[in-house]
Structure formats: C-alpha cells, structure tokens
A protein has these predicted regions:
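Conserved C-terminal RecA-like helicase domain
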Residues: 337, 466-590, 749, 753
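Short, conserved "post-DEAD/DEAH" coupling segment immediately C-terminal to helicase motif II
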Residues: 154-159, 376-394, 622-624
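Catalytic cores and motor modules of nucleic-acid processing enzymes
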Residues: 15, 19, 54-55, 261, ...
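Conserved helicase ATPase motor motifs in RecA-like P-loop NTPase domains
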Residues: 268-269, 373-377, 389-408
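ATP-dependent helicase/translocase motor core
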Residues: 2-292, 301-317, 334-337, 344, ...
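Conserved RecA-like P-loop NTPase helicase motor core
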Residues: 344-345, 368, 529-668
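Interdomain helical connector at the RecA1-RecA2 junction of SF1/SF2 helicase-like NTPases
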Residues: 207, 407-496, 510-520
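Conserved RecA-like ASCE ATPase "motif II neighborhood" in helicase/translocase motors
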Residues: 338-385, 569, 573-574, 590-592
Length: 826
C-alpha cells in the first residue's frame, strides 16, 4: 500500500472528528473566520444576549477587546468574561468558554487561507465557540514530524494574527507519530516541549486516529485547555501539562474527594512534579468540601529555585518569612483556601497553645496536606505532630525516588508507611522513552593499579579508606582525567559540570590540585559546614576552606562575597552554573549540595568520586538529564569509584525492574558504549557517500528531493558524530575507513551552505520542500575557520577543471565570510 497523502490524512481526520461530535464548517479566509466567530458567540451567549444578536458596532467592540494581544494575553482573556454596555444601555457579560463541556460549540475546518507576510493555508483547525483553539498540521507518513513543527514556526512568524493568537494547543502528526504542545510568544518553538499523548498507564498513543479518539474527545480536550494549561506570567508563556501529569492530578483529586485516605505520586526526577503537585493543590482548593489546602515544603528547600518555580504558577504565593504568626493569619482568613508554607512553621503553629483557638476550628474539618519532594523534607519527623491536631486531614506526597524496603529511611519508614497508596507512576524508563528526560552515558574509570574488574568489590569497595582514596597519586590521576576530557564531555565547554566528592577534605584537595594546574577551566566549590566540627585528623577547618574558596571566587568572577553573605554566594553560583550569568562556571565541586533538587538544562556532566546508592545515586545522576537541545543527547556520568553494581540496582529499583534480567535487553536508561556509536557513524557515512560520493557532487544535486536526501543523511551523521566526540577514546583513525575528519568538515561546509541558502536566500514566495526540513543546526558544532583548514581547501582546488575550480573558489570565499579570524580577513 502506498503512502497516505496529506490531503487523504486531512479528510480522514475530519471525518473522524465529525463522528466525535464536531461540526464541519467551511472557512476560506480570515473574514469568514470572524463571521463564523460572531455567529457562534451569539449562539453560545444566547441567554446573556436575551436572544438579541450582537449588532455590527457591538461585535466590532468585541473584536477590539480580543485583537492586538500577545498569545499570553489572549490566553488570559480567553478565560475571562467580556463586559460592556450594549447600544440600548444594557450591561452584559459575554463568555468565551464554559467549563461544562456540553455547553460549548465544537467545530472543525480545514485549509483556512490567511495572507500575512506570505500567504499560508492551515491544515486542520478546531474551533470552540468560534475561536480557533487547536491547530493541527499534518505530514504524510514517512516525513519527519519535526517538519510540521517548523512549518508552524513559519506560520507564527508570517501570518498568525488576531483570533489565531487564541490558539492554545498545536498538534502535529504524520499519521503514525503524533505530538502536541502549547502555543507561545517565544521566537522559536522548542522541540523539547512537544509531547506524546498516552494512556493512564503511560502507553504512547501514536496513531492519529487513536490520538483523536482520546485527545479530541470533547470533554478531554476542554479539560486540557481549561484545567490543564498553566499561564506562566513570570516567563510570559503557556504551559500545557503532559499526560502523566494530568492523569496523576485526576487520580489524586478522585482519591481526595472519594476517600479519607492518603496517597502518593511516584514521578521520576526531572518530570515536572512541582507543577503536578501545584495543580493538584490549586484544583482541590476550589472544592467546597475541602476547607483548606496546605502545600508544604521544607525550610531548607525554600531556595531561589523553589521560589521561582512556585511564583510561575501563582505570583507572590510563597511566604518567605520565618514568622509562624504569618501562617496563622492566613489560616484565619476564610477566603484563603490554598496556603503555601513550610513544614516547620506548620508544626510550630500546631504546637503553640496561643494559636489553638484558630487552629481548633479546622480540627474536625476536611483539610489537605500536599508535600512536594516528600523525602527531601522533615515531614516524616513532624507528621505525627500535625496529624495529632487535624483529625480528618489527608496527606499526599510527591517523590521521584520512593523509599522501599531496600532503601527505607534512617528511622525504618517506607513511603507507603506515611502515604499508604501509590496513585500514579511515571518511572525513569517512561520518561526516557518519551524524551522527557535524557538517558545516561556512564563511564567507570580505573583509579587503582592492576587489573580492574567493575564487578569485583574487593578491588575498590573493599579498600574504601581515606588513605587510599585521597592518595596524591590518585588525586593527580582523577584531576588530570577531568581536565583532559572536560571539553569533549561538555561539547567544547558549551555545557557545565558538577564534581561530587566524598568529603570536605577531599573537595579541598581536588580544588587545590585543579587550581595548581592552571587550566583555563573556571571552577567553584560550595558546601555546608558545622561551626564546632572536630578537627582531629584534619589539616584545616571547613570554614577556613570555604573562606579561601570564596576569596578565589571573588577574584575569578569579580564579586565581593564572604562567609557572611553565603546565601548570595550560593545564588551567584546557581546563576553561573545555569549560564544565566556570565562568565559561567565550568565545574562546581560539591559534597552533598546541588545533588538533589537542582535543575539546570545547561548541566550535562557529573564527575563522581564518592559512594552513592539507591535514591542518592539516582538523584545525583539526574542533575544531568534535563532535556535541552540536540547537542545534549544524554547526561554524562564519569565514575571514579566502582558504582556499577549500585547503579544497576538503583536504576532497576526506580524503574520497577529490580528483578529484571537485562543481559539480552540493555536497559533504556543506559546509553550504548563507544563501539556502538563508532559503527553507527560508519554506517551513516557510507549512506551519505552513496548519495554524494564526493564533496563536489553535492553541488550537482539539482533537484530539491536530492538535496533533501543529502540534508537528512548528513544531519543524522552529524548527530552521531556529536555523540562520538563525547567519548574520551574517540579518534578519527577509528572511522577514517568510512570518512576522514577533513571529509566530514568538507561535507559539513556544503551542508551549511545549503542551510544558508534555504533560510536566507531562497525566494520566499516560492514553496519549497526544504522550507521546513529540520537541519538540527545546533549539533553542527561549527569550529572557527582557521588557516590550516583554508589551506587544505586551497590544496584541493581542481585546477584542471575550470568549472569545478570556480565552484571550489566560490566555496572558499563563503568559508572566509564565516570566519572571525583577522589573519584570514585581511
């Protein structure tokens, strides 16, 4: 059977939507879109309008209210009422949406043509009450779905205006792969923020027909638009929740309303638990049967990152003071149903007799406690105190690494002991499969002489003493390995790293060694210390170590911090490690800080010289696995201790596969080794050569189909090359039987030339199949053009063939135009 064309796919989807209760409506252009909106607005508000449709002037006033807004402003307006005086003096309130699915009018149209900077036709548009709220772009089977995303990007820039700013959700599909994502005012759409829709048990729904049955169910679509979109006024964007976040929210709310029991959500680290927990708290606070919802966090976790995260969802919602009295005032306020506070303040309020009169009012009422990152907090210790007071309270915890029998807490408690039932799971294997977090490339480096067996505990773990691990020879070996390999691990320093050490003395020794080598790496260190620590066996007090490290930091980054301004110092480190502030920190040395709860997309590498197991291991590794762009395909973990067994057990436990045998089926969370990517590079290089046997032959690819084939082949090759170069053992000699380094650079140059032509020089009025192709340009790490490179090009000029010589010289001219080397600019 042949490929289904886009037109066939479009018609099939429309017929499917008609069976789901959508009315087919023909809308040819923007004027007809406005006319249809007017008709549906009148129908939807028939009671408020007392059966008197809007006059021309009144509708014009409605359009004036709705138009001229950004995507974010439009989303806010969509959820509000429009109030104005009618021509006869009557005051009315018009609604644009109803939370009751059956109250709304659902329509579907296709091929709406809009003339903006260029003329564009939109594939399929879903309208609710006449407003275009969902836009669907389709590609035929076999076409990369990213091309549909790029097409939407063009539409947003060139022709979306007015009512099209009310689009909340985009859907892209090639019939066998389907994704959805939120609209945005950002200049470019991030492909990392496009999501697969799934079942409640995290099974992906890829086929467009199945996706339509679930996602475009009218009640589900309305919930996804109204309940499960978040207006982030801090970052000025829309957030659409992912399916597992939605299902977890619904499961928790059902459990809270239908039972009096507790529960917990197990969603892997990095999957967006804070948003899910916040949404649960927000929705529960709107239920009449619930008197108060307390969102509890630990005082020590109320850092800058936590405050930023919470304030994205509701501005100024976090009370940063340590005053218990402030909390009690909030509890006393009957109109304030949702309270964000710390576990410590809540426990203090309950224990203090002077607040009993206020708190006793809720002793027998239904109240909800939601605990984010429930195992990072002291909730277990204070649970009894709080529970003793609130007799009908329900407790809901969120965790990425639950406590089981294997890793129960110091007091012997498991997650189920505190929170009873697990209500929803989204495990690390699910998140990696869905591309919501990255997998790990793990290297175990031998740091002791003799034959190293990663499964032989007697070689490393059996001699776990400070004397051995902190020997000068070993410190030198580890330090030099880090310095020699850091650039390849971090893509020439594009990304940042954390170095986890076993103790403050170990950190100090590594810090001093790196400093003494005068590398060009910018390093920093941070740790907490005890004022009255035992100095036996130590050369230096931890406080003094930190003081001199801060002095170094001030010189390196032109700052003025001290021990007294530790919080500001820590904040500055956070910003530089996240590359929010320049210059960035290349490597941050830590002991325990930053190994849990720290989220940074630009962090891609963790060096480990400490023993880790179970939840501590997964939490530490997960600092590196936030999705960013194609140049960050995985998190790099470099272990200088024998953590192989601990890693396997921990990752299996938190993927619910502790007993699984993965000998024949490698786990999804571990990236294949160097050999796999070396062989893959060769395979793709030979494929590239079958399309363009020589660099010059790229110029002879006259048809757009042939050019497209070349672009896709080189793009895939470049992705593997970017992975290969992160391995310390990589050498071009290993792959030169397929393609040499110079050959790769030459093909890359032609690739970039074609990219420039498509993006900058092509006549924009002419439709091209190359318009929306994904060049994945971020993985083509363009090194600075140097003299050696240009000389190699000159040596390869074909002087015998005048036509080819002209092409070669033109190519060299283009390369010179790219350079910022003044020696070549002259």
């Amino acid at each position: 059977m042949g490929y289904q064309s886009e037109a066939e796919l479009e018609n099939k989807l429309i017929e499917k939507l008609k069976t789901q209760g959508y009315e087919r409506v023909l809308i040819n252009d923007y004027a007809e879109l406005e006319n249809n909106f007017r008709e549906q607005l009148n129908k939807f508000n028939i009671i408020a309008l007392e059966n008197k449709p809007l006059t021309d002037k009144e509708f014009e006033r409605v359009l004036n209210v709705l138009n001229g807004k950004s995507v974010l402003q439009s989303a806010i307006k969509l959820r509000e009422k429009i109030d104005f005086d009618r021509e006869d003096g009557t005051k009315i309130y018009l609604k644009l949406l109803s939370e009751n699915a059956e109250d709304n009018i659902y329509q579907v149209s296709n091929q709406i043509t809009v003339q903006g900077k260029y003329k564009n036709r939109y594939d399929v548009t879903i309208l609710i009450n006449g407003l275009p709220l969902v836009q669907i772009e389709l590609k035929r089977s076999g076409i990369d779905i990213n091309e549909a995303i790029n097409q939407i990007d063009r539409y947003r820039i060139h022709s979306y205006r007015g009512l099209f700013h009310y689009i909340q959700i985009y859907v892209v599909s090639n019939s066998v792969e389907t994704r959805y994502f939120a609209n945005t005012d950002a200049q470019r759409l991030l492909k990392s923020l496009t999501f697969y829709w799934t079942t409640e048990t995290n099974e992906r729904i890829n086929k467009l027909e199945d996706f339509s049955s679930s996602f475009f169910n009218k009640a589900r679509l309305l919930k996804n638009v109204i309940r499960y979109m978040v207006i982030n006024e801090t970052d000025k964007n829309l957030i659409v929740m992912r399916p597992y976040q939605i299902y977890a929210t619904e499961a928790l709310i059902r459990h809270a309303l239908d039972t009096g029991k507790n529960g917990y959500i197990w969603h892997t680290t990095g999957s967006g638990k804070t948003l899910t927990s916040w949404k649960c708290a927000n929705l529960l606070s709107k239920e009449q049967s619930i008197k108060k919802v307390f969102f509890l966090i630990d005082r020590k976790d109320l850092d800058i990152q936590t405050k930023e995260e919470f304030n994205k969802f509701e501005k100024d919602c976090v009370d940063e003071t340590d005053k218990t009295e402030t909390l009690v005032k909030q509890i006393k306020d009957i109109d304030r149903k949702l309270i964000v506070t710390t576990i410590q303040k809540m426990a203090n309020a309950v224990k203090n007799p002077k607040y009993s009169k206020i708190l006793d009012k809720y002793k027998e009422e239904k109240v909800i406690f939601i605990i984010d990152e429930c195992h990072r907090s002291q909730f277990g210790e204070m649970h009894t105190t709080i529970k003793h007071h609130f007799k009908r309270a329900q407790y809901f915890g969120f965790t990425g690494t639950p406590r089981f029998e294997e890793n129960k807490s110091q007091n012997g408690l498991k997650t189920s002991d505190l929170f009873e039932k697990c209500l929803h799971t989204y495990l690390i294997k699910n998140a990696i499969y869905d591309h919501n977090v990255l997998g790990f490339s793990i290297e175990y480096i031998q740091t002791f002489k003799g034959q190293y067996d990663e499964n032989d505990k007697t070689m490393v773990e059996g001699i776990d003493t400070d004397e051995v691990y902190m020997a000068d020879e070993r410190i030198d070996l580890v330090t030099n390995h880090i310095i020699n390999n850091h650039k390849c691990k971090t893509v020439n320093g594009k990304y940042t790293a954390i170095f986890a050490t076993s103790s403050i003395p170990a950190l100090a020794k590594y810090y001093d060694k790196i400093k003494s080598l005068n590398s060009d790496l910018k390093i920093a260190a941070v740790f907490s210390y005890g004022e009255n620590e035992d100095l036996e066996g130590k050369d230096e007090h931890s406080k003094d170590i930190l003081a001199r490290i801060i002095d170094d930091y001030n010189k390196e980054f032109d700052t003025n911090f001290s021990l007294e301004t530790f919080a500001a110092y820590n904040k500055d480190i956070t910003n530089r490690l996240k590359i929010k502030k320049s210059p960035k920190i290349d490597i941050l040395l830590v002991v325990n800080m930053y190994l849990t709860g720290f989220d940074s997309r630009p962090l891609n590498t963790l060096y480990v010289d400490k023993n880790l197991e179970w939840h501590n291991l997964v939490q530490a590794f997960s600092r590196t696995n936030r999705v960013e762009m194609a140049s960050k395909p995985f998190g790099n973990i470099i272990c200088y201790r024998n953590l192989k067994s601990n890693t396997d057990k921990a990752l299996r436990l938190f993927s619910n596969e502790l007993e699984a045998n993965t000998d024949n089926n490698p786990p999804i969370w571990i990236i294949p080794g160097y050999g796999y990517f070396r062989d893959k590079f060769k395979e793709l290089a030979f494929k590239l050569l079958s399309i363009a046997p020589t660099v010059q032959s790229v110029d002879d690819l006259m048809s757009e189909d042939a050019q497209r084939e070349f672009v896709i082949a080189f793009r895939e090759l470049s992705k593997i090359k970017s992975i290969l170069t992160t391995f310390s053992e990589f050498s071009w000699a290993d792959v030169e039987d397929a393609l040499t380094c110079q050959g790769y650079e030459d093909y890359k140059s032609r690739y970039l030339t074609l990219y420039d032509f498509v993006k900058k020089e092509r006549n924009a009025e002419k439709v091209s199949i190359l318009d929306d192709i994904d060049f994945a340009i971020e993985v083509i790490q363009t090194d600075k053009i140097n003299v050696t490179y240009i000389m190699n090009l000159l040596r390869n000029v074909d002087t015998a063939n005048k036509k080819q010589q002209a092409k070669d010289l033109e190519h060299i001219k283009q390369e010179l135009d790219r350079t910022d080397n003044p020696e070549l600019r002259r």
